[in-house]
From Swiss-Prot:
Gene Ontology CC terms: cytoplasm
Pathway: Amino-acid biosynthesis; L-arginine biosynthesis; L-arginine from L-ornithine and carbamoyl phosphate: step 2/3
Record note on quaternary structure: Homotetramer.
Pfam family, one: Arginosuc_synth
Binding site for L-aspartate: 118, 122-123
Binding site for L-citrulline: 86, 122, 126, 172, 181, 254, 266
Keyword field: Amino-acid biosynthesis, Arginine biosynthesis, ATP-binding, Cytoplasm, Ligase, Nucleotide-binding
Protein name: Argininosuccinate synthase
InterPro entries in UniProt: Arginosuc_syn_C, Arginosuc_syn_N, Arginosuc_synth, Arginosuc_synth_CS, Arginosuc_synth_type_1_subfam, AS_cat/multimer_dom_body, Rossmann-like_a/b/a_fold
Organism lineage: Archaea, Methanobacteriati, Methanobacteriota, Stenosarchaea group, Halobacteria
Biological processes annotated in GO: argininosuccinate metabolic process; L-arginine biosynthetic process; urea cycle
Subcellular location: Cytoplasm
Family: Belongs to the argininosuccinate synthase family. Type 1 subfamily.
Catalysis performed (reactions): L-citrulline + L-aspartate + ATP = 2-(N(omega)-L-arginino)succinate + AMP + diphosphate + H(+)
Length: 396
């Protein structure tokens, strides 16, 4: 059997708590190090993890990865990345968490890495996509031992582990800087109407309205209402502000990587606002061909990010394209908050691919081109379609 030390992705919840003795009893490791990675969770979660680790008698590390996570979130903004219509949050956080745990494992000379993910979710794949590129063994006790929640509760009670049945509430909640997800319980039923108390970041949309100016440099958000802000602070500020107008709620049936459909409820006020502003600015500064191709890039970027393979060679190629096109995406967009929406209402940039004279109905000639010059284009437009339809009709 293996020996040595294993680094465990540790939240202090039921799954990771029971993993601690199981990694010793079932896997043969001598010691377990719990690693909790900060990607913007509430402070109470870190306190709970520290207390649980102390009660279990395991070494515990807390790693601050908020800056790295915020940078990846802004990469997602540059890519207009959404999966099945919602901003990626949990998916973006997992590779950052996995990297941080791997760094601790390497620094502490650990022989293996472990997580408490089930065999039905996406997170097992996202963690292991990072870890299996290393020389460490990977352990997944919940999946590999076929554990159920009922078994875990009974096991914890028998060994007097610091877990109380039901202490995690009716819902399964995952929070980070970019999004808050709520699932489980009755929310698993597609026809169940969730109560208002599942929401913590967003107020119910009302008639109250407001505006905010978002400034971008090379596709990256850098200021709110003219005040320069670091990424973490900018996201936190917009979460509070947009959330107060009910912006950023999603209730959906999500297709997971293993083929399961799972109902998810998300809150993502800052993400919704920044994505809307960024896309509006692109509409001002990119050509039609660039916008069309960027849509395909966005879909592929989001898919790879959802899968947790942000180090995939394709991502390097996609980011290379974005580096080129985003160089022009600098300017300011005004967003209106109204009825739970973030709606772009103004945009400006020195790189605007726009001519007010050319678009005006009151201008006859622009850059030597007159309205009448469009006649030849109009005659040819749709020409091939007319030929095809005539040929089809003639063969009936």
């Amino acid at each position: 059997m293996p020996s040595g030390t294993v680094a465990l992705a540790f939240s202090g919840g039921l799954d990771t708590t029971v993993c601690v003795p199981l990694l010793k009893e079932e896997y043969g490791y001598d010691d377990v190090i719990g690693v909790t990675v900060d990607v913007g969770q509430p402070d109470a979660e870190f306190a709970a993890a520290r207390e649980t680790a102390a009660a279990l008698g395991v070494e515990h590390h807390v790693v601050d990865a908020t800056a790295e996570f915020a940078a990846l979130c802004f990469d997602a903004v540059r890519a207009n990345a959404t999966y099945q219509g919602y901003p990626l949050g949990t998916a973006l956080a997992r590779p950052v968490i996995a990297d941080a745990i791997l760094s601790v494992a390497e620094a502490e000379g650990c022989a293996a890495l472990a997580h408490g993910c089930t065999g039905k979710g996406n997170d097992q794949l996202r963690f292991e996509a990072v870890w299996r590129a290393s020389d460490h063994d990977v352990c997944a006790p919940v999946r590999e031992l076929g554990l159920t929640r009922e078994w875990e509760i009974e096991y914890a009670a028998e060994r007097d582990l610091p877990v109380e049945a039901g202490n995690e509430g009716e819902w399964s909640i995952d929070t980070n800087l970019w999004s808050r997800s709520v699932e489980g319980g009755h929310l698993e039923e597609p026809d169940y109407q969730p109560p208002a108390d599942i929401y913590a970041w967003t107020d119910a949309p009302s008639g109250e309205t407001g505006t905010v100016d978002i400034t971008f440099e090379a596709g990256v958000p850098v200021a709110v209402d003219g005040t320069a802000m670091e990424p973490v602070a900018l996201i936190e500020a917009l979460n509070d502000r947009a959330g107060s107008y009910g912006v950023g709620r999603t209730d959906m049936l999500e297709d997971r990587m293993l083929g399961l459909k799972v109902r998810e409820n998300y809150e993502h006020p800052a993400a919704t606002t920044l994505l809307a502003a960024h896309k509006a600015l692109e509409g001002l500064v990119l050509t039609k061909a660039e916008r069309d191709f960027t849509a395909a890039v966005s879909q592929q970027w989001a898919q790879k990010a959802y899968e947790g393979v942000v180090e995939h060679p394709l991502m390097d190629a996609l980011n290379g394209y974005l580096d080129e096109t985003q160089s022009a995406v600098s300017g300011t967009v005004t967003i209106a908050f109204e009825g739970g929406r973030a709606r772009p209402i103004a945009r400006e940039s020195e790189h605007a691919v726009y001519s007010a004279d050319a678009a005006s109905f009151n201008t006859e000639t622009v850059a030597g081109i007159e309205q009448a010059d469009a006649t030849g284009v109009a005659k040819y437009h749709g020409f091939q379609s007319r030929l095809a339809n005539a040929a089809f009709d003639g063969n009936k």
